[in-house]
Structures are given as structure tokens and as C-alpha cells.
């Protein structure tokens, strides 16, 4: 006679099923939390930056096209699945088990799709997502080995006999949660105006660290001949293989159009690759030194190469692609050219000039992107609305100061005029 409790009442499979459910819940919670922190930081100190590795990077996932569905972070659906699996282990029943087996089958299919998308399209893996994948596969394997219908040995009997009542109940609860999640997401997005004002205030309160002793001659935006003459002066310590640097580049592409003629952006090479950067303890982004040399080889073509690298972000990790890039731009000698290496090294070394911001790191510049905006340092990047607010404040300050200088007349001059 076939038993009717979860995973045939076997103790360890049932405990493991509970652990897999709780694991999916925990991983989903941190995924959702990171999604909102990355996309809607509450303060200037929560900006996203790269200092883990090129592959294991959660920001790439948080900024991707599939991070949300109609405003719902996909981690929410993982949270629901994990909750159902954990509850099924605590309150076992034949119907609950068959329903969870069906859900676990669909869940593992989704995991496969997301894994393929992350690895082959994004070229990275979020550690929180990886944790969810592991627990999801564990749950599926447990239902496969110990679930109902094992004596029949057929896929249909194991995974395609859910309880319609439980499915409907789960769908209703999920729908209520979806509504709440959408409302919360909208509230976070709508609150960005108020957050932007707070960001501007926090930016003003940052200590003035000043510009580096050597400002890179490689500018992505030039509004004035002299760097300090623009209302917005941005020095961008960046790595061509950093996903957060890609995000910042996309933000700046929008902002440079809106603030045309008012912004200078100097690209300060800072590859997180120990081949050319002594600050980096290990090769976080192998190949980024090569890309820096290629981009720096011919200053006249820097912007072209810069844009092409970021437009082919995933391909840029491939050594063959980098060789072809160098060939097309006539920069085959870049990797051995002492002049190119010297200027890139000079730019990198300016990162050592800043006082360290954490006891964990020896220098102030230690991750990418790091921005020096009008002499103030921001580690990481910020959402478009917040960056725009900071830029607008700088422009208004500059124009107000300019107007004051133009219309201000000394007291003695006014007396003479009378």
C-alpha cells in the first residue's frame, strides 16, 4: 500500500525538502532585496560597483531585461515556490506533495532557462541566483527519487497530477502578493524624486577630495578645452569588463545628451586586472589591461574603441575578439608599446593618491566604477534620476555663480556711478 505523506514519509528526504524550500526562500529574499538596492538606492553610499569578479556579479542580473516581469522582481516567484515546498514538508499530504512536485518540475525548467540566459547572454552569475538554482534542483531531485508515483516509474505520475484546489489557492495567494509587490515597486520608483533631493544633499556633504594629479587625456565627452571650465567635471575610474561600468556608461550616454555643452568626462583607466594594476590582488577581470592598452594606443580613435568595447561587452572577454579589435583599429602593437603602457600606468597609479575609505583596502580607489564629480568621490554608480539631480544642481550652481559675477558691481563702483 502506497503511503500518502510527503516524500513517502521518509525522514531525511522530508528534512532535505524543507531545507530546499527554506533555501529557495532565503535566496529569493536576497535577490529581491538586491534588485531594489541596485535599482533604487536610498542614499549615495549604496551605489553599485564591481569588486567581486567578472563572472560572479549580481548587479548584472539586477539591471538585466529579465530582472522583473511587469514590475515584479522574478525573485518573488521563487519566494512563492520555496514557501510551498517548505510548507509541504511541514504539513505533508498526498495532494500537497503531488502539487509541489508539479511546481518543482516547472521551477527547474525555469531555472535551466535562467541559467542559460545568465551564463551565455549576460556572461555572469549572481550568487543569490546560483543559490536558488542549487536548492531548486535539490527539490526536483527529491521529488524525482522519493515522490509519489515512484513505483510506476513514469514522468507523468510523478510530476503531472497536481491538486487543482491547491493550485488555485496558491495562484490566488500569489496574485495578492503580485499586487502588493507592484504597489511597492511603484512606490519605490515614485519616491525617487524625494530620494534624488536627499542624494544631492548627501553629495554636497561629501568631503572634497580633489582631482587626481594627472587627469586622463582620454575624454568621452568634451565641452570645454580646460577640464575645470565645465559646470560638470566627471573623472570616471572605469574597467571595460565591469558590468557596473557598462551600466554607468549607459547612464552617461543619456545624460551627456541632456547636459550637452555643460559636461566634461575623463575616462581614467582602472582595469581590475593584476597584470597592470598593483591595487588588485587577483585578476578580477582578465583581459581588461589588454583592452585599456588597445583603447589608449591611438587617442584619436579612443571614443570609437571605447564605444565598441561596451557595445560588445560579453565578446570583449574573449582573447580572440580582443585581437581582432586591435587589428581593425591598427593597435596590434598596443600590448608592447612602452608609450601606451606608460600613460595607462600613470593613469592607474593616480588611484593610489586618495585616502583609503575602508580598512579593508589600502587605497581610496579600489573598485569600479568610482567617480570624482567636481572634486567629490562617489564609489559605484547611481540610477539615472539621481545622477541627473546631482548634475542639475551643479549646473544651477555654476550658472548662478556666473550670473552673480556678471551682474555684481562693487560698492565703490556704484558710488562713482551715482
Segments from the language model and where they lie:
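Membrane-interface segments at or immediately adjacent to transmembrane helices
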Residues: 181-229, 235
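Structural alpha/beta surface segment adjacent to cysteine/selenocysteine redox centers
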Residues: 235-238, 246-328, 361-363, 405-418
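Conserved redox-active cysteine motifs that mediate thiol-disulfide chemistry
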Residues: 49, 57, 127-129, 237-251
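Functionally engaged cysteine thiol sites
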Residues: 49-54, 58, 129, 275-278, ...
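C-terminal cap of thioredoxin/glutaredoxin-like
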Residues: 150, 253-256, 323-418
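Catalytic His-Asp charge-relay segment
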Residues: 233-235, 370-371
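Membrane-interfacial helix-loop segments of redox and metal-homeostasis proteins
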Residues: 2-189
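Short pre-active-site segment immediately N-terminal to redox-active cysteine/selenocysteine motifs
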Residues: 73, 125, 238-241, 367
